[in-house]
Amino acid sequence: MATTKKNEDVEFVRTGYGKDMVKVLHIQRDGKYHSIKEVATSVQLTLSSKQDYVYGDNSDIIPTDTIKNTVHVLAKFKGIKSIEVFAMNICEHFLSSFNHVVRVHVYVEEVPWKRLEKNGVQHVHAFIHTPTGTHFCEVEQRRSGLPVIHSGIKDLKVLKTTQSGFEGFIKDQFTTLPEVKDRCFATQVYCKWRYQHSQDVDFEATWDIVRDTVLEKFAGPYDKGEYSPSVQKTLYDIQVLTLSRVPQIEDMEISLPNIHYFNIDMSKMGLINKEEVLLPLDNPYGKITGTVKRKLSSRL
């Protein structure tokens, strides 16, 4: 039998509950021209009371099944113009509908569907799955507070076969890695940024700008590329250029795993393999991260 006595020796740091991976396909029909948004949404609520944890009293709990249904209904009545706006709609609903909800955290991930196109003509209702970067967002709002909005890109896998090297690093008794002036550079981009505010922000267009900037700084000019002396330098260059192009972004976090491709030794077969046949290695892999933010002076 559950105890009804509160333990005075411990205190809550944070609580939350909700529903994860609520999937929705929303279809906007404008005559024969259809537009779609498929999303997976996770919602976490924090309540003012902790009586459900301490005493097993469920009288304040909004069931997670209700949370799931709410996501479905908001998609119907509000639509999904962008995943960021949809997440803000969810936050606003729970904070305005339930006085004992003090915090709402919403994560939304968009399935990368792209409209079919041929010879410049777009199909009116057919789409193809194009995994060239997944658009996600996180929105958190507290009672009497403004929403804090993060957007991001993940699962954007890119590779270039040259214009990358790694030299001049520390060498000790455990170092076996040779310096290299020319190598393959492959990574799977994770990029997340925070907006200063939500007013007059075109979230879809901003996401496209950031993604294009990532590809631009990774690849360089189409006819010759751009040399990368390290993953760190490429990461930083992406951040600096992005913040210069999008003034609404306050800070940006990037994670770039260094996905390795090694030359296969064919000497025992009497063959010389000049970086033509390489072995992809899933792990271990290097992982480079960095977060930058605008200096206060740059916002004045």
UniProtKB/Swiss-Prot annotation:
Where in or outside the cell it occurs: the entry states: Peroxisome
* N6-acetyllysine, modified sites: 6, 19, 23, 32, 114, 118, 160, 171, 181, 217, 224, 274
EC numbers, comma separated? 1.7.3.3
Residue positions where N-acetylalanine is found in the record: 2
Which GO CC annotations does the UniProt entry carry?
Answer: peroxisome
Active-site residues from the entry:
19, 64, 260
| InterPro entries for the chain | Uricase (IPR002042), Uricase_CS (IPR019842)
Question: PROSITE patterns under this entry?
Answer: URICASE
User: N6-succinyllysine (modified residue): where?
Assistant: 6, 19, 217, 224
- Phosphotyrosine found at: 285
Has keyword Acetylation? yes
GO molecular function terms listed in the Swiss-Prot or TrEMBL record: urate oxidase activity
Which pathway is this protein engaged in? Purine metabolism; urate degradation; (S)-allantoin from urate: step 1/3
Which positions bind urate?
Answer: 64-65, 166, 183, 231-232, 258
Q: Where are the transmembrane segments?
A: none
Tell me the keywords, alphabetical order: Acetylation, Oxidoreductase, Peroxisome, Phosphoprotein, Purine metabolism
Q: Which residues carry this modification: Phosphoserine?
A: 35, 59, 228
Q: Motif Microbody targeting signal residues? A: 298-300
Query: Quick one: a GO biological-process term for this protein?
Result: purine nucleobase catabolic process
Q: What does this protein do?
A: Catalyzes the oxidation of uric acid to 5-hydroxyisourate, which is further processed to form (S)-allantoin.
Q: Which family does it belong to?
A: Belongs to the uricase family.
What PANTHER family does the record point to?
URICASE
Q: What is this protein called?
A: Uricase
Species name for this entry?
Oryctolagus cuniculus (Rabbit)
User: Lineage in the entry?
Assistant: Eukaryota, Metazoa, Chordata, Craniata, Vertebrata
